[in-house]
Regions:
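Flexible "arm" and connector segments at domain edges
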Residues: 1-68, 74-200, 204-267
């Protein structure tokens, strides 16, 4: 199959996509926009596509999920193409690295031993393997290797989990609740904008820790709260439109009453 045939091959799979990307990045005949992109310039798109995958999952839209997973795969192919051009890595070496990692992290699956390990022992092995991986990357500190690019709440929980492994953690949830109350007081007493900024961050960090102790994913919890707010406010708007009004023509008293009405209808 020649190159043009591969571009239009309906069942060309990953090789088809890799060839399309090479064509887009071709310095002589490629797309000017695609040619000038770098790891850094497409990084925001990589994050955006990952969130769009999550959005499709949460909406249970499987047709859209297929497309969004393709968009996310394109980001991996894009980074791989840039890496290949710079002699760093290519798509196949990326696949080999993650394959090796998965095999190494699952000795209970990929070894010849017939002895089954308990879930607790598997977790211990997993943590030991990850610790060895961090050491290989010279990540010797307890908090080394927690990605800076993670959503802030997710990163907070990961940092707290790492600290907890070495004993730096509150033993009971009541202690975390006391700290939440303390941080709220410090926020209300903050005088400057910079101080309020700092204290609000401290409060959010402790709330993430509270979520961790309660075994709640704070990112998912906040996403659910966002969806609930969107659903309820949209219903408030619908009720206003039905009355011949709009949010801008209404007032807080009326909208608050409608909000409580919507809440009551959900119960």
């Amino acid at each position: 199959m020649d190159n043009n045939d591969l571009i239009y091959a309906k069942n060309g799979g990953i090789e088809r996509l890799l060839h399309i990307m090479r064509s887009l990045r071709d310095p002589q005949t490629g797309c000017p926009w695609d040619i000038k992109q770098t790891f850094s310039s497409i990084a925001p798109y990589t994050i955006e596509e990952a969130y769009e995958v999550v959005d499709a999952i949460e909406r249970a839209d499987m047709a859209d999920l297929k497309g969004e997973l393709g968009d996310l795969l394109l980001q991996t192919v894009y980074h791989a193409a840039i890496g290949e051009e710079q002699g760093l890595f290519d798509f196949h070496s990326i696949a080999d690295v993650i394959s090796d990692k998965m095999v190494a992290r699952h000795p209970h699956v990929f070894t010849n031993s017939s002895q089954k390990k308990s879930k607790h022992k598997q977790t211990q092995d997993w943590e030991k393997i990850k610790e060895e991986e961090r050491k290989a990357l010279n990540q010797n500190g307890t908090l080394d290797g927690v990605a800076l690019g993670l959503p802030a709440l997710t990163r907070a929980v990961k940092l707290q989990n790492r600290a907890a492994r070495v004993g730096f953690d509150w033993p009971k949830v009541d202690s975390v609740l006391d700290k939440v109350s303390e941080e709220i007081i410090e926020l209300t007493e903050a005088k400057s904008a910079l101080h309020r900024h700092e204290e609000f961050g401290d409060l959010m960090f402790v709330l993430a820790n509270l979520a961790r102790h309660l075994k709640i994913d704070p990112e998912q919890s906040l996403r659910d709260a966002n969806k609930k707010f969107t659903r309820r406010f949209s219903e408030v708007e619908r009720k206003l439109y039905k009355k011949g009004s709009t949010p801008t023509l209404s007032n807080l008293t009326e909208m608050d009453a409608l909000w409580n009405e919507v809440k009551g209808e959900e119960k």
